[in-house]
Amino acid sequence: MKTNIKHHKKSIRPQAIFVLAIILIIIVIVFAQIFFAPVWLNRFGERLTHPFTSVVNVKELAVTTDTDGDGIDDASDLVDGARLEVKNHTTYRSNYYIGGYPPDDEGVCSDLVWRAFKNAGYDLKSMVDDDIAANSGLYPLTDDKPDPNIDFRRVNDLNVFFPRHAETLTLELKARDADNLALWQRGDIVVTKRGSSWHIAMLSDKRNIDGVPYVIHNAGPFPTEVDCLEKWAANGRIVGHFRWEY
């Protein structure tokens, strides 16, 4: 006697598919937040959570200087150079290098800055080294013993250099205030301090819905372009805001 055995395939319920899709989306968003510049995610989230909030438009600073003669103004070149660090996925690694420069695929927050300047046609290392050599007493970390292998990569030193050679700007940030936000422009340099920890970053040419610029920086594990400037300001972490004198 033969027994007929029917094999029934279990069908996946629509609810399960929906839950799996939500989980997958969350994983993708978290992954992007950690490893990539989540500008598009931030903007999508803003429109999703504030569908009726108007976008604050901020007048962009006009810059005509083109130091490297590539047809792109210096401020835009700085931003492009900083953004290249994000694109290149530079690994955050803090080491001492003979000659000063780390490998192209390594760096810390200050390396993003000098690379951005290099993209605009400036040799930030030489400028910092020359200023320290001529004014070592102004740079506490050097202790009258300049070290070109590391000085230009120390945020403490850059926080002395930029007030001397760039325009010092406001530390006050007001979201949705177009006049105040016009003082925060692409290519601006921002220095923060939290306890004894220093950090340096560059402002993006992109802004959030409230008109606040995004920040391009390397705080590890890789460089990112993120919406964190308002948080820094609210926490009192911003101790320097500079603009190169184009």
Residue ranges with predicted function:
Residues I5-I27:
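N-terminal Sec-pathway targeting helices
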Residues P38-F162:
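N-terminal capping segments
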Residues N119-L124, K193, R207-D210, A233:
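Bacterial peptidoglycan biogenesis and beta-lactam-recognition machinery
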Residues A133-P221:
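...with weaker cross-activation on analogous glycine-rich loops/strands in unrelated enzymes
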Residues D210-Y246:
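Low-complexity, Gly/Ser/Thr/Pro-rich intrinsically disordered linker/tail segments
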Residues M1-T3:
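N-terminal intrinsically disordered, acidic low-complexity segments at the extreme N-terminus
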Residues I26-F36:
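Hydrophobic alpha-helical membrane-insertion segments, chiefly the h-region
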